Amino acid sequence: MDRDIKYEEVLAQIKLYIKDEATLKEIQKAYEYAEEKHHGQVRNSGARYIIHPLWTTFFLAQWRMGPKTLIAGLLHDVLEDTPATFEELQELFGIEIANLVEGVTKVSYFAKENRTQIKAQYLRKLYLSMAKDIRVIIVKLADRLHNLKTIGYLKPERQQIIARESLEIYSAIAHRLGMKAVKQEIEDISFKIINPVQYNKIVSLLESSNKERENTINQKIEELKKILITEKKMSVKVYGRSKSIYSIYRKMNQFGKNFDDIHDILAVRIITNSVDDCYKVLGFVHQHYTPLNNRFKDYIATPKHNLYQSLHTTIVADDGLIFEVQIRTEEMDELAEQGVAAHWRYKEGENYDIAKKQKDIDERLDIFKRILDLENISVQERDEIQQEVYKPDHLMEQIIQNDIFSSLIYVLTPNGKVVTLPFGSTVLDFAYKIHSEIGEKTIGAKINGLFSPISTVLKSGDVVDIKTAATQKPNHSWLVVSKTSSALEKIKKYLKKELVEVTSDAKSVNLEKIKQTKSQIEEYIAKKDLKWKLVNSETQLERLHAINFNNIEDFLLDVANDEYTLEEAINLVYLDHETSQNEKILKKLQDKQYKKAQLKDDIIVQGISNIKVVISQCCLPIPYEDITGYVSKAEGIKVHLKTCRNIQSGDKQDRQVEVSWNEAVCKNKQYDCAIRIEAIDRPALLVDVTKVLSHLNASVQMMSANVSGDLMNLTIKTIIKVSNADRLQQIRSSLLTIPDIKVVERVMM
């Protein structure tokens, strides 16, 4: 569909609900501006470019969006594709519209930059745009819908990329926002491009049974009208509802069903005036037809995460026909079809309070708030709790994949309470959903009577009885086990609190040690009558600097920890000697310090001794890669790859120190290394991977696999033990010999 569309056609659609002349003039002003800016530009179809923003705005008008959203639709490409500037838009149309257009532009730009694969950064842009102003994404959905409808003018390989992106990202966004009609249209167009054989097969099956199906459903509609309107005198609307092609395919594929086994292809929708009437209608329907057990769903009492509300029941008619009935109010039906967009529907004369509308959506779709919270994690917080584990990209991708792009599962407590979780949730996620304190003490669960560890993935229908222990508490490995953002946040909060407590306790202990050591030194000096040999404080500090101590307190703590004897400490720092004797003592202690580091640490920190050194968990450096040390207030020196993105900012470069691998120690050690494997999914592929790793004696610490929808792309993430970079290359080369594996690469955690 790249047929020409005139502004008058779009205006006619707008005038169905916007009558104010001043508002209509402002919309026309935006159209004239867009037409001027896009003058001379053409689309791949050869059509004038202005056709695209006109169609985008037409869709927005069909959804009854407000005037500012319509104007943003007309202008949504001017910043990206024309010389127009933000300042010019602000001057002509105001800051709100300028911000909307800029928001759409940023999302579009990021999509083009990252189109080769779904990246967490792209997803972040989309969802942060929603959290800031939901209208940005509504405009973007209208934009994408028209681009899909005209996708036939692109090269086949480009069609595939855009169709996959639309199916994996934009249909999921429409679903999350409850925009069912848009979701179905995006899915069906994308599915037709990605899998034309299956698409045409289902179309053929639908067409072959279409007449019979229409007659059958019309018969049931008339039966229900007679029962509800004629006999029960209820004010209702009754009509048929068709299932989308992609949803039929997904149900056939996911549950292994035949076309004839899918009962909700046939469905009747009943619209009532009130919630009370919904339940009255349900009672009348069940009086006249036989309801199927376990096929009743009350989404009015417990709405879906995307705000969807309705009663669903599957019934059997006297003639044996099985069909679904959906019962809802007018408002629920509008929300079911348009979702969040329904909140922004423009009504003439209404107090159109944008801040209030966005606040209402934010409160009801709390996922956006959680994403904003992640965006605002402070540097200090990341320093205090192993910042590498909570990298925004990694956690963002988890949240979006687990909380938004997934189906839901329904799990039962032992007393029959239903708990809703994202698909892929574990026992640990379930425990935290029940209560934070239960989550913190969880050691496992009985699933359907059998004991299972906290990492066990749950499925719908499981009866889960959580087992706890008083001594149990969260640890960093739980961040890998947990799949839901809410559980991750609670674990993170606990670990932060624990770290603060441990650090506080350690400081108190250290202060007491320093105090005691200082008293012991003073007693020793007094007992030996050495006060006359004491040097001044300035000389003491010079001597401390010579052996890499910044202050007397750090040195006294080392003495307290038996790194030096009292006599060594006093002779070295406090007493005056002949120059030759001072140099001799200094040399002896420096040698001792260096040997101690040689024996203990696999990382040598140049110019600093007796300090805690840890391998950073974000980049997991391995011998003998180029590394650098980052001075962390809470954890000493953290060793990163020099190329690690987490230490590239200017403020972090100021806190870096030179470090090197201690070959004498690290040659006998194994180090964690994270890799990602991209492959075409097939039976026994995981078995082949584990066989190769086993043959190479590679110790696997963690492995997860994920198939992306119907596209059969398998991603395996694993952490293995390696001795050095050469060993990693050997493992990588061996994995690449496995058929259907396309990529094996080192990844950040």
From Swiss-Prot:
Which GO terms of type biological process are on file? guanosine tetraphosphate biosynthetic process
The UniProt function text for this chain reads: In eubacteria ppGpp (guanosine 3'-diphosphate 5'-diphosphate) is a mediator of the stringent response that coordinates a variety of cellular activities in response to changes in nutritional abundance. This enzyme catalyzes the degradation of ppGpp into GDP. It may also be capable of catalyzing the synthesis of ppGpp.
Q: What is one GO cellular-component annotation here?
A: plasma membrane
Q: Which reaction does it catalyse?
A: guanosine 3',5'-bis(diphosphate) + H2O = GDP + diphosphate + H(+)
Give all residue intervals belonging to the ACT domain.
Answer: 674-749
**GO terms for molecular function, please?**
guanosine-3',5'-bis(diphosphate) 3'-diphosphatase activity
UniProt entry tagged with the keyword Manganese: yes
The enzyme's E.C. designation: 3.1.7.2
Name this polypeptide is given: Guanosine-3',5'-bis(diphosphate) 3'-pyrophosphohydrolase
An example Pfam family from this entry, by short name, is HD_4
What is its EC class? hydrolase
Signal peptide range equals none
Cofactor(s) annotated in UniProt: Mn(2+)
- Pathway annotation: Purine metabolism; ppGpp biosynthesis; ppGpp from GDP: step 1/1
Transmembrane ranges, per UniProt, are none
Keywords, comma-separated and alphabetical: Hydrolase, Manganese
Please list the disulfide bridges: none
KW Manganese (keyword) present: yes
